[in-house]
Structures are given as C-alpha cells and as structure tokens.
Amino acid sequence: MKGVKKEGWISYKVDGLFSFLWQKRYLVLNDSYLAFYKSDKCNEEPVLSVPLTSITNVSRIQLKQNCFEILRATDQKENISPINSYFYESNSKRSIFISTRTERDLHGWLDAIFAKCPLLSGVSSPTNFTHKVHVGFDPKVGNFVGVPDSWAKLLQTSEITYDDWNRNSKAVIKALQFYEDYNGLDTMQFNDHLNTSLDLKPLKSPTRYIINKRTNSIKRSVSRTLRKGKTDSILPVYQSELKPFPRPSDDDYKFTNIEDNKVREEGRVHVSKESTADSQTKQLGKKEQKVIQSHLRRHDNNSTFRPHRLAPSAPATKNHDSKTKWHKEDLLELKNNDDSNEIIMKMKTVAIDVNPRPYFQLVEKAGQGASGAVYLSKRIKLPQENDPRFLKSHCHRVVGERVAIKQIRLSEQPKKQLIMNELLVMNDSRQENIVNFLEAYIIDDEELWVIMEYMEGGCLTDILDAVARSNTGEHSSPLNENQMAYIVKETCQGLKFLHNKKIIHRDIKSDNILLNSQGLVKITDFGFCVELTEKRSKRATMVGTPYWMAPEIVNQKGYDEKVDVWSLGIMLIEMIEGEPPYLNEDPLKALYLIANNGSPKLRHPESVSKQTKQFLDACLQVNVESRASVRKLLTFEFLSMACSPEQLKVSLKWH
C-alpha cells in the first residue's frame, strides 16, 4: 500500500458499551491515518480509521501484556456507531487500547506513532521570522491572534486567558517559548530560534468570549490508586501496591512467575492523564474531580509535556539576565556526543561486559518506563571478584541480598548519552543520602543492566499518596513537621555532597526521594544532573519536571546549583499540602504562573510553624542571589526540628 509506514496484526478494543471485547485486527499506519482492517489484504474499508491529527497522547499501560493506549479527540463529524454515540460528547476524548504480540512490536508501534503524530512529535520553531507581529486576543473569535501556528495550537488547548495576557504578556511569551523548546528539541533541524519583534498591547475586556479549554472530564480522569510508576531514568522506582506482569521468559533464562490477577483487577498503571475512566469521572462531583485532576499532573509519565529527556549539555551564558537561545554549534555538539559506539565504550569503563543472568533471580517486575523495566531481584551468585569494575564500587555484596535491576535496551534508546551520564555520576557518587549503585553489566552491546540497592520503603510520593482529606477537599499531610524536617535535612545532606562536586541534580521532587524500611532517606534519578565547570559556571538547559522548576529555568536564564534549592522548597510545599503549586493547572498555564507569580504561597500558612515558613522563604526567593545555598539551609532552625529515622518508620506503614 502506498504511504504505509508500519503494519501488522494486533488486538484492540475501544472504550464504550462493548469495551470488554478484544478484537484481532490488521493495523496500518500511513502518513495521515491509523487504520484497522479485518484482514491483511486491506482491500476493503477499514473498521476504524483514526486521523493522526486527532491523536493527543500515547502511553504504555498494563491493562494487558504488551499493551498501550491511544487517546484521541473526537467531534460530531466522526462516524460513531449509534449504540456508542450516547456515551460520547462533542469534543470529548476517547481511548483505543492496542495489544501487540511482543515487546519489540510494542516499542516499534510506539516509536512509529510518536514520529508521525503532529501533536506528539513536537513542532520545530519557525525560521527567518523577523517581521513585526501584533499579538493579542480577539473577542469576536474568542482566541489569540497574531501568534505563530505552533503557539496558537498550544493556546487553544491551554487555560491561559486574555486576563493572563493583560496581566503579564511577557510571561505568556516566556511560557510559550519554554514549552515549545522543551518539547521540540529532539525534532529541531538546527533551525534558528524564533526572531520576533512582538508588539505587546493590553487587551480590552470583551463583553463575551469563549476560551477553548480542555474539558474537566478530560483532565480529571483517573483515581489516585492508579498513579504509579515513573521509570524514565535508569534508577529504580518502586510500587508498593501493584505487582505488574513479569517479563516473558526467554530461552537462556527463566524468570519467576508472577501473579497478574491484581493488575487485571486494578487496571492500568501507565495511563494517559487525559483519558482514563471518563465514565467514572462523569459520576463524580466537582470536588472529587478537582482532587483527581491534581494528581494526574504529578505522574505525567507519557504526556506531551515530557516526551523526551533532554540532554544535560548546555550552552554557557555570559549574561545571567539575558535570554538564552539554542545555537547550531550546541546542537551539533549534542549530536556528536551521542555516537553509540563511543558511548558504549565509555559505559564499559563502569559496566562489566558479561552476561549477568546467572548472578540474579528476578522476583517481580516493579515498574516499566520508556527506557526499560525495573525488577526486584535476588542475588544468587557473585561475579568474578578480580574484575576491577566490580571492585571499584567498594560496596558490600552478599549472596541472597535483594537488589533492584533496571534493564535497558540500548538499541532502543534515542539518547544514550543521558544514560551514560547518569551511570558515570552514580558510579562516582558514594554518600549515605544517595541511592547506592552496586554494579552494571552490558550484554552484547545491546542491553544494559544497572544494579542498585533496593529501597523497600518506596518513594516519598507513596507516603504523600496516603493523605487523608477533610470535608473541604483539602489535603492533610500524613507527615508531621518533625518528619518533614528530617526528610528535608537528609535531602540537603545529599545535595550538599553533589554541589560540592559541582553537580546539579535538576529534578528534586518527591518521586526522586526514596526511603527504606529503616527510615533512611536517599536521592535517586540522576538522568538530568549536570556538572558545573569553570567554563560553564551557569547552565541554561531546559530540563527537570516543570511544576518543581525554578523561575530562572522557565525564563531561560543562566542558572546554577540553587535551582535544586528552589525544587527542595517546592517539595516541602508538596509534603505540607500533598502536591506542588499549580499541579491542578494545565502545563502551559503552570509555566506562566511560575514565570509570573514569583514565590508560591501556602494555602494555609497558619498550619505550619514559623521555622518552616522561614525555611520556605529562604528556598523560594525568585532572586537567585537572595536564595540560600544548601550549606546555608543546613543551619536553619527548621532542620533542628528533625525527628529520628525510627520516628519516620511509622509513616512508612501508611502504604
């Protein structure tokens, strides 16, 4: 068939009255459509044809083995069967669930769909765009005018209003530039940045207008119990409640069978944050929907806001207050640094080039991410002790110990440099508040196994998920201030170690703080970390998780290790209120608020002590020079309130 990009047999089902039925179909991806046929002849009308322009999200789920979900927008013009039309509203979102035969097929379909869908693959910046543009809001059409097409698409699906524009139009522009660059870097073809002279004029309030927003039923779509599993980095993430499917057996190694009934009962884990359980959310009141919506934001694992992990390399900026742009030479450097053979050779300075399967028994699958799967495992044999890479780590290893293993298919990773970066940093970072890297193995230059200490307490997010709610719908934290102070103090100790080595973590949040059964607190996930040098004492790369980002990153200014201090302050708010500021906003609106509002405020400041508020104030200074360093934070009275590890163990029982 002409224009076919990928085709093959799959099983699928759609949400609706007969959503329990899985049907075998021949799936064809071309330049414009995703078509489902009854046979591989494809000589008849497809059973279902989905325009690629309507696909808003694709994410892996565990509804079935080797399964992923496609979220698509629908309208009145779409051909929907009468029996299902009752369940769908105009401009709503619908899900299609697709199961493939093998893991490789699944990754192949995900890659192909991401590459062809315009709403997923990012939009490159306009080039040679130098004329003066009059940007504003037209009350007649209820939309923004005079903006580039890529920005118009973003604004149409965001909650940014004409009031936001009037209040701070420059912050809106900054949010748009950041969002587009953040999502579009991997598809940039060395284009120059948008070079626009914007005429920013205040807008008159229209008597009547309509802003195109996402509907509440789209955003508030999944229950808290399904919010599990972020494994974008090579570090392990633990899921204390779910036990997902095991990896299929292969010829030379047999994995332990794992019961999957619980997964089938509880449903999806890696779900699209805008799709799941629409029929359930329609039954919820506004208060309950608001609760669900706020937690869709926290684990935005496969959303359009974070489709790829960006490289840690960044151009230096001479002027701290000037806007930093991507330059061709920086992108060329990034491209050259991602040479697969060179990266694998560097990995082998840390990783052992042998098959590790005889050394471990994989007990159960603990998580699944874009880069690979995490398994809870048991060490059954020690590798050869004369290997210098094994001896270098100085970690005590014993047969029978439990470890976490991240398996990564290197051939399927678009940015191997990020994995190498994380591997090298972990190998060189031995400190009691940083998760221990034990060893790593490379199998035939194709697969990387990273062996880490097992933190059975899970991540801090698991504890925060155990919150109780008052009648007003507000969060009440399961942690008291003494426990919060202990977690923050231990995190500060880990950050002090990193900052002394001129390393910025750049992604501090509750998901990346792990605990063990003894109440010890450790930092994980070094995929975004970067090293400061004399040549580059400031960085400008747009990385991290947006809701925890410092304003200087959103404003695309140079930054240093104090971005970790800001994120630490946001994490403390997260512990107090159960979520970071603006989590109930769509990503673009959240970026605008970070750029516009400055230091976020507690919803109920009277609920915490003066010491806590003083600590937060020191962390959340917009002026970087006024923001405290980690070394300074360790002297604050708030941290003297810290409890003992034993007193934190009580909260670990919540999950």
UniProtKB/Swiss-Prot annotation:
List, as start-end ranges, the regions of compositional bias called Basic and acidic residues: 265-276, 318-327
CC annotations in GO: cytoplasm; nucleus; plasma membrane
Q: What is its EC number?
A: 2.7.11.1
Q: Does the keyword Transmembrane apply?
A: no
Q: Where is the CRIB domain?
A: 123-136
Under Pfam families, the record lists: PBD (PF00786), PH (PF00169), Pkinase (PF00069)
Q: Where is the active site?
A: D507 (proton acceptor)
GO biological process: any one? negative regulation of gene expression
Where the record annotates domain Protein kinase, the positions are 360-639
Cross-referenced InterPro entries: CRIB_dom, CRIB_dom_sf, Kinase-like_dom_sf, PAK3-like, PAK_BD, PH-like_dom_sf, PH_domain, Prot_kinase_dom
Q: Which reaction does it catalyse?
A: L-seryl-[protein] + ATP = O-phospho-L-seryl-[protein] + ADP + H(+); L-threonyl-[protein] + ATP = O-phospho-L-threonyl-[protein] + ADP + H(+)
**What does it do?**
May be involved in cellular signaling or cytoskeletal functions. May play a role in morphogenetic control.
Cite any additional comment in the entry. Answer: Present with 238 molecules/cell in log phase SD medium.
Supply the name of the protein.
Answer: Serine/threonine-protein kinase SKM1
Organism field:
Saccharomyces cerevisiae (strain ATCC 204508 / S288c)
Native organism taxonomy: Eukaryota, Fungi, Dikarya, Ascomycota, Saccharomycotina
